[in-house]
Amino acid sequence: MNPTRNAMSWEELAIHAANPIDQINGLNNPYSSLRLFNKSESEAIVTLYRDNHAWCPYCQKVWIWLELKKIPYRIKKVTMRCYGDKERWYLRKVPSGMLPAIEIENHVITESDEILFVLEEIYGPLGQSLNETKVLEHRRLERELFSSWCNWLCRNSLFPAQEQKKKEDFKYVARKLENELQKNTSGGRTPITTKNGTQPGSADIVFILYIERMNASLAYYKGYSLREEHPFINTWLRNLEELDEYRGTQGDFHTHAHDLPPQMGGCFTYSNSS
């Protein structure tokens, strides 16, 4: 019988540790307090106030936008109200406590769409503007999909037919999204062509926040695989997951399954065992 090996020392373990990431100029990551993209720190006139744990979908929307546009910015983290008390310093700056917020040259803006409108004015849109006709149509579709998901996930069904109706309503809207995705051979919704190929645009950013959460929550609470049931959505998600800008913000299934109930007021499974 071989003798038990002594545990490795910290010095020995350090040899096997991964090199520390460059949080400022490297890949997108949730730990940064400053992002420069190899530009001067003097260009970082935007400060993003987001939640501590990268759980807030609307913070994620602004975060991805800044990363895709490579806009230098600073990050300050704040507690979401459904998980604890707001920091007093933040309430002095934003009395409502709303997240996300950005600060540009002492001007504070809240509401994720309003933030993106301001950023578009300064830095230009990500592909098509949020106010362009087609993007407005996509934004309405996203709200329709969100509503059908909430109705299925967050409202308890009293009998099987009610549960099935909610499921079919969600599938109907999800297929409408798939029909839109099929129109774009690149797999994106509002892509912009760059020297490196096709990148997502404004409507992609609007959709990804809650589709990421739908994918996790419906699997966990309803046993419904969004990606298997909707292959065009799956392709679109795969394309986004190849991007470091998105992947650095992406939450895992366990996180979303358990961070959503406090935010949404509850998530319900359905059992017909009775």
Q: What residue ranges belong to the model's regions?
A:
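GST-like domain detector, emphasizing the conserved glutathione-binding G-site
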Residues: 1-196, 267
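Short amphipathic alpha-helical segments embedded in low-complexity Lys/Glu-rich regions
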Residues: 78-84, 193-196, 224-228, 253-259
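Short alpha-helix boundary/capping motifs
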Residues: 93-95, 233-235, 261-269
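Acidic, serine/threonine/proline-rich low-complexity intrinsically disordered regions
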Residues: 159-165, 219-228
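Extended, well-ordered alpha-helical scaffold segments
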Residues: 165-173, 227-242
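Substrate-binding/catalytic groove segments of enzymes
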Residues: 183-188, 215-220, 246-249
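GST superfamily/GST-like fold recognition
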Residues: 195-222, 232-234, 240
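Long, charge-rich low-complexity segments
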Residues: 244-274
